[in-house]
């Protein structure tokens, strides 16, 4: 499910994310594309948004995570990360916070795809239980 903008002349968030991936044109774009694919596999009904002047955000009954791109890192920030189990210890940033946790991916890093999809599914379940 893709969320589209109702404003005339604005591109859908999904198209903006596509353009960002293409614009990056390097390992960051490849990483963001791979992460996006994994998120969609884990949560097929995910909604994509484009926030804060260029940050992809994935929603399902609330925010799941962002996909921020910087010069040397792709940062995946989970809004309720502190409440998620992370048995494979994917979270490696923002560990001191009360709510958020992040996964920083640098060039050449390997992401445990199975563990990542489990985190996405758990975040979706947590959002669903909070929405009731």
Annotate the PLM regions.
Residues 1-132:
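Charge-dense, helix-prone N-terminal extensions
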């Amino acid at each position: 499910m893709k969320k589209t903008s109702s404003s005339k002349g604005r591109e859908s968030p999904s198209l903006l994310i596509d353009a960002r991936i293409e614009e990056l044109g390097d390992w960051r774009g490849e990483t963001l594309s791979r992460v996006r694919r994994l998120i969609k596999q884990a949560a097929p009904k995910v909604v994509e948004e484009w926030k804060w002047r260029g940050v992809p955000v994935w929603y399902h009954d609330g925010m799941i995570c962002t996909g921020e791109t910087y010069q040397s890192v792709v940062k995946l920030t989970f809004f309720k990360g502190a409440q998620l189990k992370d048995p494979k210890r994917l979270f490696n940033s923002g560990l001191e916070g009360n709510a958020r946790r992040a996964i920083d991916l640098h060039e050449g890093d390997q992401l445990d795809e199975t563990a990542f999809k489990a985190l996405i599914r758990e975040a979706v379940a947590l959002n669903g239980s909070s929405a009731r």
